[in-house]
């Protein structure tokens, strides 16, 4: 198919004619009768099964420094929704158990397997597919859905329909590296895809389609859309960055889930360093002094507005303990409570435009 695209591109974009092209290999035109192959023919591998996908998830457990996990292009390799959902369920259960990663699910851009047709999904098809997935795997703050597909120019200069997961990973990692994982990677500041050419699905980013886009958001669909920007015209971007949590608290925002993962991944090695040290308030004070600059920086970076570290770090005797108790401490156990006030991504801006009809005169002054 790529070779056919190359010929098509040469005819339409370069040659601008419909004249037939002559292709030669080794100075000769290839024919059906003359096929030459030099080398050793290998054994073609089979498409992985759902069980093989699930077994491969176990290998991820060796790595806890990542934030984003996905089964890339799984809907292209597995031809039935039943098999796809089976893998998604196993991945979701692993992420919920370990609480180390966020798992991203791509809503297939076509209504059928690509070998059976290439009809793009519309709003209702997207919602139906997510509902089917939720019915199989359930809701989770560690799972997020991305939909819409995306159009790119391929290496031959031809506009092609693509999956979005690679782009989503790029947005998430770039945002985390430059701004911190606690910042949303959607919207006009960190979610613009400058070489994207719009979604495969209908563009629900138009202002006239606000209700449809909002309906998709209510069903946890984070969409690829085209929107007008203040200074760069129309741009392709990711709009919304929600998890699939049912409870309407701050962890319905993927940025807050990622903040909690950041806290876990950052504080864990510091706390582990103090294992086997004397379990006494002097050690607790040292722990607090080591983590305090990290937490202060999170306040400065608008990850949280304030925090409270409650770990009896100021105690001087067992009688002054409030979070811990003497019995547990003397068994080598130490407990800390970290409370913070989160800062969530802005989702709605309301401006009231009022015409003042009370005044009957207008004064115009000119500054010289």
Regions found by a protein language model. Give the residues of each.
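Extreme N-terminal leader/targeting regions
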Residues: 1-5
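Structured, hydrophobic secondary-structure cores that serve as assembly/anchoring elements
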Residues: 10, 16-19, 25-33, 55-368
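Short linear interaction motifs
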Residues: 35-60
């Amino acid at each position: 198919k790529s070779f056919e695209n190359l010929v098509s591109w040469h005819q339409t974009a370069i040659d601008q004619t419909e004249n037939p092209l002559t292709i030669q290999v080794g100075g000769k035109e290839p024919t059906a009768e003359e096929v030459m192959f030099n080398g050793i023919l290998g054994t073609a591998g089979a498409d992985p099964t759902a069980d093989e996908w699930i077994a491969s998830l176990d290998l991820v457990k060796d790595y806890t420094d990542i934030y984003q996990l996905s089964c890339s292009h799984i809907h292209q390799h597995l031809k039935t929704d039943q098999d796809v959902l089976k893998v998604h369920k196993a991945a979701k259960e692993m992420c919920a158990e370990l609480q180390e990663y966020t798992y991203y699910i791509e809503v297939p851009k076509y209504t059928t397997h690509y070998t059976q047709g290439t009809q793009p999904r519309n709003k209702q098809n997207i919602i139906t597919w997510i509902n089917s997935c939720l019915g199989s795997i359930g809701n989770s703050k560690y799972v997020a859905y991305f939909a819409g597909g995306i159009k790119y120019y391929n290496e031959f200069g031809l506009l092609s329909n693509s999956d979005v997961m690679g782009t989503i990973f790029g947005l998430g990692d770039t945002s985390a590296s430059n701004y911190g994982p606690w910042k949303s990677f959607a919207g006009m500041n960190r979610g613009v895809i400058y070489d994207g050419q719009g979604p495969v699905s209908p563009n629900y980013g138009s202002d006239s389609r606000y209700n449809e886009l909002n309906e998709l958001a209510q069903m946890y669909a984070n969409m690829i859309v085209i929107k007008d920007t203040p200074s760069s015209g129309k741009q392709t971007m990711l709009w919304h960055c929600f998890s699939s949590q049912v409870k309407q608290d701050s962890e319905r925002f993927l940025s807050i889930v990622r903040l909690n993962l950041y806290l876990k991944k950052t504080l864990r090695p510091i706390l582990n360093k103090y294992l086997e040290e004397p379990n006494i308030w002097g050690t607790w004070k040292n722990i607090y002094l080591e983590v305090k600059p990290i937490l202060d920086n999170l306040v400065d970076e608008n990850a949280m507005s304030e925090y409270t570290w409650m770990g009896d770090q100021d105690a001087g005797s067992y009688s002054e303990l409030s979070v811990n108790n003497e019995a547990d401490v003397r068994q080598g156990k130490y407990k800390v409570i970290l409370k913070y006030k989160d800062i969530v991504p802005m989702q709605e801006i309301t401006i009231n435009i009022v015409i003042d009809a009370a005044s009957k005169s207008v004064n115009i002054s000119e500054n010289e």
